[in-house]
Design a protein with these regions (language model features):
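Carboxylate/His-rich catalytic cores and anion/metal-binding grooves
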Residues: 193-199, 203, 259, 266-297, ...
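Flexible beta-alpha connector loops of hexameric P-loop NTPases
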Residues: 145, 300, 310-331, 363-378
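N-terminal pre-Walker A segment at the start of P-loop NTPase domains
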Residues: 208-243, 278, 286-302, 307-318
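Conserved P-loop NTPase nucleotide-binding/switch module
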Residues: 342-385, 389-390, 402-429
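Conserved NTP phosphate-binding and transfer environment spanning the P-loop NTPase/kinase superfamily
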Residues: 390-393, 399-566
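N-terminal accessory targeting/assembly segments
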Residues: 1-196, 207, 566
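Phosphate-binding/switch loop-helix module in NTP-utilizing enzymes
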Residues: 322-356
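Glycine-rich phosphate-binding P-loop
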Residues: 242-274
Length: 566
């Protein structure tokens, strides 16, 4: 391995040369506290920045093993260190001068959720640390300005590493606080099963967000207060006792007037599948980790999904036990989303009537009289929601503001009034008894066997050079194959889409042979991430910073890839 001084001399030697001479810097260099690896050099100052990684051995990093002795605590510590490093380098970005992206210093931007990322990886076996970052190698026009890169690598970066990535430079109480919060969050997750709950929202939580485009907590928002009848007290290993609203297993209905906080509560529950950072307001909003948000999704593709539980006898005699379409309607898409969610192993569905297909959710009595059940191919969700829970153990939390039919099938009814929840189950049931319940002739409840087998796809693997493009949190483009993920609302970060793109390619290249079922393919992908780490999916020419998606989002991505056939 070359020394830091070797790198400095090399940079002096290529100053004022044409930009491609920067390629000669690729390699690893030993600095006093770390090894600097120049992994990829950009082609010109206007291209995507160069990729650089900082490697710190465990003895130098010196983080106590108690901070990362479980997977969840390790992810939380990695997240904390990444945020500290991002703050440390921010004042130096673009301080070095030049053309295009010269002087840029960048690292993954973490949101409010704590995610496993390839940008910061702590090895649990020896405590060593790797941080991946971007640096815009400076130039004037397309002429190397290596004296500016020397400033970055020798003046700016060492101090940033020293103060943000070494335990001795960090606040030990803050580091311990990250681990303690994680332990408490995991304790709540364990308590959900023990106490028969689908979710827990702590008293004092701040659920509203700052704006529609900001995930920061809203200032001066009304703190959450549990209704007494639903209040649960849990005992956490660090915080001690904590009280809040426990949502029981079964069918829960959230009602209330417009703008009173129904959807805000549901959105907090959607994100409760992730742990949140301290100060977010949702640190102690914990939802069943397998929860899936359901919605209608006009125009999505569906491949060989048995939706006969909800859709049957379509015009043209389409076989709904093996339904495929390139242009799904609202009701067929939502039916497929339910079945695919079951296949993905969910224990909880989250549904907002505002984003659902009305004819999929319920039919009123007048419509039943005008259009007979025998002429209606849709079995509405209200006719299956009890069976989903009683026969499959899948609970549902639904937001409703227009139809009262679900009062008859709900176990718990929560009314949001001026952002405060009230348990109105008894009153709602008493009132509902004065009205006839929804009834319809439905077919027996039968769950598909889930034997779909993804076929090999030349559209994903057929070219010599696979081109991958990720468009924010919206879609993945592999060669000419577009996977639209806009309706997968529990994806929170563009790097999760980078991860999904890498998983999709890995599955296409190594897993999908027409013999393995979709469940088996996803099992293999998860096993690889568990055993070899998320970074094992990294490959040249593909998105560089990955965040790990949940099992449910892996299924949702594969199900929405138009080029995949089952």
């Amino acid at each position: 391995m070359q020394s830091a001084n070797d790198l400095k001399q090399l940079l002096f030697g290529i100053n004022h040369k044409s930009y491609p001479a920067y390629k000669s810097t690729r390699g690893a260099y030993q600095f006093p506290r770390y090894t600097l690896s120049i992994d990829h050099v950009q082609g010109d100052p206007f291209a995507a920045p160069s990729r650089v990684s900082v490697h710190i051995n465990g003895k130098t990093a010196a983080f106590p093993t108690s901070l990362y002795d479980t997977y969840e605590k390790r992810v939380a510590l990695q997240d904390y260190l990444l945020r500290q490093f991002a703050r440390a380098i921010a004042p130096y970005s673009f301080r070095a001068k030049g053309s295009g992206k010269s002087g840029l210093l960048g690292v993954s931007r973490c949101g409010q959720e704590i995610l496993e990322r390839t940008a910061c990886v702590l090895n649990p076996s020896d405590g060593s640390l790797i941080v991946n970052m971007e640096i815009g190698f400076p130039a004037n026009g397309r002429t190397i300005a290596s004296q500016e890169l020397i400033r970055i690598l020798f003046d700016f970066l060492p101090g940033c590493v020293e103060k943000s990535l070494l335990y001795r430079s960090l606040d030990p109480k803050a580091c311990a606080g990250v681990a303690r919060l994680c332990e408490d969050q995991q304790a709540i997750r364990a308590a959900l099963k023990e106490k028969g709950l689908t979710a827990f929202i702590a008293d004092g939580s701040i659920l509203p967000r700052e704006t529609g485009v900001s995930d920061l907590p809203m200032k001066h928002a009304v703190p959450f207060v549990s209704p007494e009848s639903l209040r649960v007290t849990l005992y956490l290993p660090n915080r001690g006792s904590i009280s809040g609203m426990g949502i029981p297993l079964g069918v829960t209905l959230i009602v209330g007037g417009g703008f009173h906080g129904k959807s805000t509560l549901l959105q907090a529950l959607e994100r409760g599948v992730y742990n949140h950072i301290a100060g977010d307001g949702r640190e102690y909003v914990i939802t069943d980790a397998s929860a899936v948000k359901l919605r209608s999704e006009d125009s999505r593709s569906i491949s060989n999904v048995d939706i006969s539980l909800f859709i049957h006898d379509l015009p043209g005699k389409s076989d709904t036990t093996s339904f495929s379409t390139a242009d799904a309607s609202g009701s067929t898409s939502q039916a497929a989303n339910v079945i695919e969610g079951i296949e993905a192993g969910t224990s909880l569905f989250l549904i907002d009537e505002d984003t659902s297909a009305t004819n999929f959710m319920v039919r009123d009595e007048l419509m039943q009289r005008v259009v007979a059940d025998s002429e209606e191919p849709i079995t509405p969700f209200i006719s299956r929601v009890r069976d989903l829970y009683e026969k499959l153990g899948i609970s549902s939390i639904l937001v409703a503001g227009s139809s009262g039919s679900y009062f008859h099938v709900a176990d718990t009814v929560i009314q949001m009034k001026e952002y405060v929840p009230y348990d109105i189950t008894e009153r709602a049931k008493t009132t509902a008894a004065e009205f006839p319940p929804f009834t319809a002739s439905v077919r027996p409840f039968a769950v598909p066997s889930f034997q779909r087998r993804p076929q090999p796809s030349k559209a994903l693997t057929g070219s010599d050079r696979t081109k991958v493009k990720v468009m924010g949190r919206e879609s993945i483009l592999i060669n000419k194959s577009l996977t639209d993920l806009r309706a997968v609302e529990q994806l929170t970060d563009s790097e999760q889409l980078n991860g999904l793109a890498a998983l999709l390619l890995d599955a296409a290249e190594r897993r999908m042979d027409g013999r393995k079922t979709l469940v088996q393919v996803v099992d293999l992908l998860e096993r690889q991430m568990d055993e070899k780490g998320l970074a094992s999916l990294l490959a040249p020419g593909r998105p560089g910073d990955l965040a790990r998606p949940r099992r449910q989002e892996i299924f949702e991505c594969l199900d929405r890839c138009r080029e995949l056939k089952f």
